[in-house]
Structure formats: C-alpha cells, structure tokens
C-alpha cells in the first residue's frame, strides 16, 4: 500500500494539470503560429509560468486499490499482483489462466 501522502500529492497534481491544461494548450498553439524567434521565446516564457506540477508528464498512473505506481495495466487500472489475485478469485470475467 502506498503512503497516503503520496496518493494525495498525486491527486493534487491531477487537479493542477486540469486547471492549467487550457493555458498550456493555447500557448503551444500560439508557438506553432508565430514565425519569429523572439515571439516564440515570449510564448515559451508563458509556458514556463505555470507550476511544475501542472505538467501532464509529472502524473503517474496508480493502482486505484493499492496506490502502487509501477506495473499498472491501463485497461483495468490495477497493478499486476492485484490483477492476478482478481483473476484467480474470478472477480474479473473473461480472463483465462495461462498454464504451460
């Protein structure tokens, strides 16, 4: 189980990313439209003004049961070992066990 403070920090980053998403998107569109280098530098300065944690690259996908940041399956939103436990308990329909 991940520490609760790490999970809360991740939620805070998600809220910040949603808040500044439109600003980042509009600034990136402006950069592509402007042809002069000085104009691009000005817009680049605007892109650097939002907080670092508002960047989408800083978000982690976490298991929604345990909060584990690694080994997650996007389709289920679960980490690998939780996914395996759910498969064995027949809580996720349509999955078959592999045996070799």
UniProtKB/Swiss-Prot annotation:
Part of the 30S ribosomal subunit. One of its GO terms (biological process) is translation. This is Small ribosomal subunit protein uS14c. It holds the Pfam family Ribosomal_S14. Residues 1-54 are annotated as: Disordered. GO terms for cellular component: chloroplast; small ribosomal subunit. The gene is rps14. Keywords: Chloroplast, Plastid, Ribonucleoprotein, Ribosomal protein, RNA-binding, rRNA-binding. Belongs to the universal ribosomal protein uS14 family. Binds 16S rRNA, required for the assembly of 30S particles. GO terms for molecular function: rRNA binding; structural constituent of ribosome. InterPro entries: Ribosomal_uS14, Ribosomal_uS14_bac/plastid, Ribosomal_uS14_CS. It is found in: Plastid, Chloroplast. It comes from the Eukaryota. Coiled coil: none annotated. SUPFAM superfamilies: Glucocorticoid receptor-like (DNA-binding domain).
